[in-house]
Amino acid sequence: SGEKRPAGAAVVVVSGGDAVSPFTTPDQACATGLAAGNSDTAIREYLLGKGYTAYTSPAMNGRGQVVDQQGFGAFGVCPVTLPENMTVNSTGSIDTAGEHLARFVNWLHDEKGVTEVDFVGHSMGGLYSRAAIRVLATTDSKVKIRSLTTIGTPWQGSYLSDYANDLM
């Protein structure tokens, strides 16, 4: 699109449940395998191709920092590994994931000059993004959240969860 974007504007791609995704910048990604992991690589490449400044937020299926992956969705030799407190635990609580994602967004402000963010959340990434937006709004973050776009986010919960909890 021909729209001029502000210098500090960025898109942050947020992975869904049980995802493992490395942190990437517009200029740096993993050197082997999928550049931004299984669920974020195609979205990242599309956004970069359209001229957006796109970052992928780090996610790990469990606590801890992102580690290189083998097998399905493999990636490795990534440029930077961010600390656990900025890494979404994609199998943990939504609220804690939101806190970690908010910390990551504030880090983007401090380290990369990001002042405005458009979130793109895949699956549970939409819920993690919504939780981060709440944290950013209540902590006087210097980053303006412009939008949240979700892809397959379970806003109404899940049928399987309702069934498992005998709500059907």
Task: Give a label for each model feature.
Residues 9-116:
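Active-site catalytic motif of lipid deacylating hydrolases and related acyltransferases
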Residues 1-8:
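Short beta-strand-to-loop junctions in surface cap/lid or active-site-entrance loops
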Residues 1, 15, 21, 39, ...:
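Generic serine detector
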Residues 98-168:
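Serine-dependent carboxylesterase/thioesterase catalytic core
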